[in-house]
């Protein structure tokens, strides 16, 4: 066998071992197509913002927090976030370029970026809060999304998953839609502790009633911070 033959066979083996790129997420096209008319129902937009104002205390955002809004869409609630956490910073991300283009038109005091939270991410920044509003069911790989969100949170940072509908009504609504979102569901309540735990997050509270789904989880503090109270007690 010639050296050339050996080289070609080695190249073929390496080629076979190379992983195939993941297929594009069809949800991107789904939301891109709907972006221009997403906020046409002005009454629905007003109702959404009014409901968020009512829930502000329960959501728990406070001035000065740096917030990552995941699945910001057209920026429907981004302005509300900016006002709620001012002088904190809001970075709003989405995987739909067309949705982000609509959001940019609003000229809000927020930074809009493209991000696929289910893909490979470089966690160069960390935030006090990651908020997923009307977004989590559309994450094609929910366990991976949670792992990525954990990396994007500071130690002690909070994940908030919020829907202005309970999981039963939301899942029923999605099941009546066409592909690719007809199977986009919120997990059952009993599944959340393990799902979050595998991502390195701890469930703090879960409200799932008619008209509201509100989950809060926390990124555990660093070991040094956990041990600090015991060390202080020992010194006393």
For each predicted feature, which ranges?
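Class I SAM-dependent methyltransferase SAM/SAH-binding core
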Residues: 68, 74-119
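Core SAM-dependent methyltransferase catalytic element
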Residues: 205-236
């Amino acid at each position: 066998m010639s050296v050339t033959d050996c080289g070609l066979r080695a190249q073929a083996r390496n080629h076979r071992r190379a992983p195939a790129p993941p297929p594009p997420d069809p949800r991107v096209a789904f939301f891109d197509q709907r972006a221009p008319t997403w906020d046409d129902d002005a009454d629905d937009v007003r109702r959404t913002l009014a409901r968020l104002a009512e829930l502000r205390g329960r959501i728990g955002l406070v001035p000065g927090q740096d917030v990552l809004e995941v699945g910001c869409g057209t920026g429907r609630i981004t302005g509300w976030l900016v006002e709620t956490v001012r002088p904190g910073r809001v970075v709003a991300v989405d995987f739909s370029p067309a949705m982000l283009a609509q959001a940019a038109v609003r000229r809000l005091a927020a930074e809009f970026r493209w991000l696929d939270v289910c893909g490979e991410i470089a966690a160069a920044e960390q935030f006090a809060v990651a908020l997923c509003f009307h977004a989590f069911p559309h994450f094609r790989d929910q366990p991976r999304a949670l792992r990525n969100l954990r990396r994007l949170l500071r130690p002690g940072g909070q994940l908030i998953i919020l829907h202005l509908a309970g999981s039963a009504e939301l899942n029923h609504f999605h099941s009546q839609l066409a592909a690719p979102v007809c199977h986009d569901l919120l997990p059952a309540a009993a599944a959340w502790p393990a799902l979050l735990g595998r991502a390195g997050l701890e469930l703090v509270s879960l409200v799932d009633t008619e008209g509201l789904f509100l989950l809060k989880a926390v990124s555990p503090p660093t070991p040094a911070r956990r041990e600090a109270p015991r060390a202080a007690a020992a010194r006393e």
